[in-house]
Curated annotation (Swiss-Prot), chain B:
SUPFAM superfamilies: Cupredoxins, Cytochrome c oxidase subunit II-like, transmembrane region. The lineage of its organism: Eukaryota, Metazoa, Chordata, Craniata, Vertebrata. Component of the cytochrome c oxidase (complex IV, CIV), a multisubunit enzyme composed of 14 subunits. The complex is composed of a catalytic core of 3 subunits MT-CO1, MT-CO2 and MT-CO3, encoded in the mitochondrial DNA, and 11 supernumerary subunits COX4I, COX5A, COX5B, COX6A, COX6B, COX6C, COX7A, COX7B, COX7C, COX8 and NDUFA4, which are encoded in the nuclear genome. This is Cytochrome c oxidase subunit 2. Mg(2+) binds at residue 197.
Amino acid sequence: MEVPPPFSPSRSPPNPSPALSVGRSTLCTSVISLAAPRAVASLPAALCAVRLGGSVVRAAAVKVTLTGTAAAAAMAEDIRTKLEHYKTAPFDSRFPNQNQTRNCWQNYLDFHRCEKAMAAKGADATPCQWYYRVYKSICPTSWVTTWDEYREEGTFPGKI
Amino acid sequence: MANHSQLGFQDASSPIMEELVEFHDHALMVALAICSLVLYLLTLMLMEKLSSNTVDAQEVELIWTILPAIVLVLLALPSLQILYMMDEIDEPDLTLKAIGHQWYWTYEYTDFKDLSFDSYMTPTTDLPLGHFRLLEVDHRIVIPMESPIRVIITADDVLHSWAVPALGVKTDAIPGRLNQTSFITTRPGVFYGQCSEICGANHSYMPIVVESTPLKHFEAWSSLLSS
């Protein structure tokens, strides 16, 4: 079973895995990914808790089906729209506090992991651009340059 | 900016700072009331008007327990309200990165293009007439007014602190850490601040200047910067 790259359970998560459809709600994706980030393809169904207007509302059970290109195309369109309307990195509920160091690090890792996974599958790497835009917004340029050098040398401390 | 011998806050230019100024006024009133009461009681005591033969003081004990509790509640409630208000999530329109060095700031705007510049203090010998000594910089931060701005603050070498009193912002710049703060400017203007964490010989000479302008002027400025 192929392992989909980790995706962000933030408010607008792109799902780079083309084999997974979770209906229309991208917010539901967050809960599913939190439940089983590495085994999403085998998840039969999930209750999706979404936050609406400050209160947690249980949405209907979301049927997770393995679909092909139609869902992938819809997902790609979603991410393209999100990228077109990108202003700056949105609030990420995984990092709600003052310390955003991990936010920068995680998005940098996610981008490179996504690119690597997409290249391995021969799939379109456009959804990975979300992580790129976010880390570009948050990470200091000098940090990114240093990490890029480490990756080239093979001494990068993160797992990509 | 602050004028010489200024005692009070600078005019608030962000909603949070407005709240902080109001809270300070309120806290100062509470402090004035307590000090007046204490002074009054002290005077009475010195004039020997408070002597008593009683050994049972239940009533007065009750009063000077309940009254301070009420005072504390009067201080805590608005304080916590502002604390939570500061943490409210407001999706920012722009992310600005401020990196502290010895002894200047680097600012980066990388949401779209890679815009980056250094900001050094204007030396007094080069200061044009009418400009503010030790506060002016060669390149100011320009931001659109009335827009939520996220600032990510870090440092390259030692501890610094990015502070702009008129906006109610002060956040430490720590090497290896990204500290996030945010603000909205309620009006256009130029707001000054100074490094607020001792960082070596020229700690007093690395000021911060934020220029808040309408969006179209900000866009014009950023186009100039990127060209």
